[in-house]
Amino acid sequence: MIKYNPAYLNLNERLSQIWLNKYTILFILAAFKLLFFSTSLRNALDVSKSYILSNCGTIDTMYSKTLNSTPHYIGVFGNYLINKALIQTVKTSLSTVSLLVYASEEILEFMVDFYLGTYECLLVAAIDGTVDTAVNATEKLIGFVNGSVGSIANDLDDGLNDLSKIINKAISAAEKVGSLFSDDDDDDDDDSSSSSKNIASVNLTIKALRNLYIPSSINDKLEKISDSTPTFDEVKNSTKNLIGIPFEKIRKEIKSINTTNIVGDPDVLYVPPINDNSNYQGICSANKNHITSFFYSMDHLLKVATIVCIVLLLIGAVVVLFPEFLEEFKLWKRLTQLREFYWYNKDLYPSSSELETINQEVKDPFNDKKNIIPDQFDVIAGYQTCFNPWHTRIVNFIEKIITYFNRSSFQNESNKRRRQWIVAYVASERALFILGIGMLAFFVSILQLIIITLLKRTFDNNSNMININSIANSSAVHSLKDDVSTWSNQVNLYIKQTEGNLNHQVFGWIEDSTESLNNTVTHMINGIDDTLADIFNGTLLYNPMKTVVSCVIENKLYTIEKSLTWIHNKANVTLPRINGDDINNLLSSSNNSTNATGSNNLATELFEDVIDDSKKIINKVIQTYHKSIIYEMIISLVFIGIWSSQIPIALVIARFKNF
């Protein structure tokens, strides 16, 4: 059984700490948080106002510089675009003239070929065909004669030999008959002997015919004539060269034209100078009163809103004391009833509903010390031990420590109980809640101070490493170059898309038509060639007929096909592109001028002022947060002080309390 232990607080003592309840503390913390937030916000507005007003001159100068230099850079940029546009226009015009010259040359050649080329082609074809036919006939005749005469001569020789033998036999028989007439006169004898001598034998031969042949030099001469006869392509090329002489001269003249000289010197174009109007009242300086009024109205509104909210929170902190008072009163009343019931009914443990039916005297909860019997079990102490175990452990732990270091001072029972009660009062649930909040807030404030100190040290070490010139010459310049390059790339993509749409929608039908016509012409030529081959292939008329058809029809079709191909290849538009590097070089050369150099120096000085002001603002912000952390630390110490104030309060109460 748990013995009586008075190390707990009665109703009056509990009510003395009611203002330390968690709800009131939360309202107070919310009020402090709102106050700190309002203070930080007001400091931020004050920093912004100071920064704007201190940099009014810089803002005015930069605004004036931008306003005064804008016409200059617009003029530089516009003159560049005008110059490039005119150059591309001249180039396009010259290219168009060159195409017209070429088209005129081709049309003239076609007309000459159409009217004179046909007859010229037929004439050349007739000459070539005649020579080729004569060469072929001569070759066949020579081959036939030279191959046939020899065999004919041999056959004739064989026949003549047989005939000679027969004749010789006849002559021999005649001579024998003549010898029978020996009585003729001498004259006759003389004539007969002479005749006999003349036809003594007959030898018939055609040896000369055997050596008969036609020499091949005739064929060589004909081939030489065929080789020396000009073809139609040679005649056509010769005519084309004669016609193209003036046109070629015109094209050379067009190519030799310098487009830059035609456009003229771009330096003649007017570029507005960079003005330095120091008498201009800047946009910031002219509105200082409005800026100050704006920040004042913001600060006033913030101050009024903060006061109203803090008052409401403090009222809420006071209001929550009443339900806490009632709850504490009801709890103590139930506990005292339970304790008295236990005293009158030793081993009885009635339920809460049964307590209401018991007819007993209700004790005064504010003056119940006389009812405590030290040797009996205390129900309130048991309740405290069961329902607040950690609080009981903390109280016992602190009591043991005090007892260990002060054994001689607390030997009697009264002092021991007084000591236990003081520890219980100081280590009550509400008091420990205040102590925990204060210690946690103090620890967080220490961490915040460490962070802000490291930040300030890093800023102080690195703030002097900022090189104004390197920043001005690197980041801004590279940013400008990157922006110009990005702009030129995007514009070129837009131009490319427009060029594609133009070629597809305007000239697309020309490409489709020329392709279709070319296919038709090719089909016609192949059909004509196939028809000629079917009719005349393998005959002497094939080549002459093919030549005639080529002169009359196919050459014209080939010319049309070539013209359609040329139109197909030339039927497109190439729009000029923008070169970002040229623009960057132009802007760089413009920045190197006297006015621009002075303006850049002024910009560098202004940039230095901005950097210095930025450093001051950062230092001010760091100091503001440092001050805010100090305030938070003070608040945490206040909470710890509130808890510490419970010690003298407990000592005073214990001085007049009877243990």
UniProtKB/Swiss-Prot annotation:
Q: Which residues lie on this side of the membrane: Extracellular?
A: 1-17, 128-305, 453-632
From the Swiss-Prot or TrEMBL record, state where the protein is found: Cell membrane
Query: Which InterPro entries does this UniProt record tie to the protein?
Result: PRM1 (IPR026777)
Alphabetized, the UniProt keywords read: Cell membrane, Conjugation, Glycoprotein, Membrane, Transmembrane, Transmembrane helix
Output the superkingdom of the source species: Eukaryota
Role, per record: Involved in cell fusion during mating by stabilizing the plasma membrane fusion event.
Name of the protein this chain belongs to: Plasma membrane fusion protein PRM1
Q: Record the organism.
A: Vanderwaltozyma polyspora (strain ATCC 22028 / DSM 70294 / BCRC 21397 / CBS 2163 / NBRC 10782 / NRRL Y-8283 / UCD 57-17) (Kluyveromyces polysporus)
The gene designation is PRM1
